[in-house]
Every structure is written in structure tokens, then in C-alpha cells.
Amino acid sequence: LQCNKLVPIASKTCPPGKNLCYKMFMVSDLTIPVKRGCIDVCPKNSLLVKYECCNTDRCN
């Protein structure tokens, strides 16, 4: 699985066991992701941050 890094022109191959790509937004600004990468389980959203997860190459 290939996931985008914070700057989407760069990507990385996820290590074994991390089979989701994610991007994290601050709830106060849902237009600019503050973090992207590989993850094993999609975190729950909170009052401050929102996560979007997906399982195809460079979907984040």
C-alpha cells in the first residue's frame, strides 16, 4: 500500500500490518490536513481532530 505523506507529491510504502492510509484534520480547519500516512486502525474522531481513512494506494 502506498500512502501520501503530508505533502501529497511524496508517498511512502506502508510497513506490514499498517494497511490503511489516513489524513488528520483539525476540526477548526477541515480544509488543510495536518498529518498523513499509514496506520493500522482508523482512530476515532474527537472534539479537536477528524480522521479520514482509506485502503487504496495514495487515497489520502
Curated annotation (Swiss-Prot):
One of its GO terms (biological process) is killing of cells of another organism. GO terms for molecular function: toxin activity. Keywords: Cardiotoxin, Cytolysis, Disulfide bond, Membrane, Secreted, Target cell membrane, Target membrane, Toxin. Disulfide bonds join 3-21, 14-38, 42-53, 54-59. PROSITE patterns: SNAKE_TOXIN. InterPro entries: Cytotoxin_Cobra (IPR003572), Snake_3FTx (IPR003571), Snake_toxin-like_sf (IPR045860), Snake_toxin_con_site (IPR018354), Toxin_cobra-type (IPR054131). Expressed by the venom gland. Belongs to the three-finger toxin family. Short-chain subfamily. Type IA cytotoxin sub-subfamily. Monomer in solution; Homodimer and oligomer in the presence of negatively charged lipids forming a pore with a size ranging between 20 and 30 Angstroms. This is Cytotoxin 2a. The lineage of its organism: Eukaryota, Metazoa, Chordata, Craniata, Vertebrata.
